[in-house]
Amino acid sequence: TSNTRSNTFGWLGQFPHFREWIGTRVMQQMAAHGYSITNKTWEDTVAISRDDFDDDILGIYSPIFQEMGRAAGCFPDELVFQALANADKTACYDGQNFFDPEHPVYEKVDGTGKMVPVSNLFTLKVGAAGATTDYTGPGWYLMDCTRVIKPLIYQNRRNPELVMQADPKTGVTFTDNQIVFGASLRSNVGYGFWQMAQMMKAPLNSD
């Protein structure tokens, strides 16, 4: 849930892990990562002739409003899965693409020490023996969604709301004899821990 124009996820770095407590606690300074997700406003608008709306005895316009409600309910899923489809070419909190062969991982959680590149993107080499041609078919994903922090972040700022403009003295109802129904919401999607997701560019089979 979001309550501002944008949210910055400064904790999206490598979390410390537990160690045996021997002697004094070891204080670890977390690496800071300024990863912001800015909310966007989305809308869907339908204009209907006021005469047609007044004469709608059979309720032919009711399915339109039902569809607007269905679309609003499905929209978060559309955003999330579009982000997933683009995740191998969109940067996450460490500056690399979310699915990338070279995520920088450091020895210490403050971002110091030896850096080791870690991959969460596997691309199968295809062709004859020794070939270096990348697999170009559809990829598939393996994700751990059991944790509190998810691989993908859906940030909701304002739930969908339906507004009707039907005042005959103002707006398009006055100028064009139309009644306008508009649905809007504010939200956005971004990337969480790449460590919880793996993209496989390879056939999904028993091999």
What are these regions (language model features)?
Residues 43-45, 66-70:
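Contiguous, well-ordered alpha-helical segments that form the cores/surfaces of helical PPI scaffolds
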Residues 18-19, 54-56, 186:
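Short active-site-adjacent helix-start/loop capping segments
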Residues 1, 81, 88, 171-174:
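Short glycine-rich, low-complexity/disordered patches
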Residues 1-40:
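Assembly/oligomerization interface modules of large self-assembling protein complexes
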Residues 38-54:
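Glycine-rich, often proline-containing surface loops adjacent to acidic residues and nearby aromatics
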Residues 51, 56-59, 63, 70-134, ...:
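Alpha-helical scaffold segments that mediate packing/assembly in large oligomeric complexes
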Residues 102-207:
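Sequence/fold signature of self-assembling virion shell proteins
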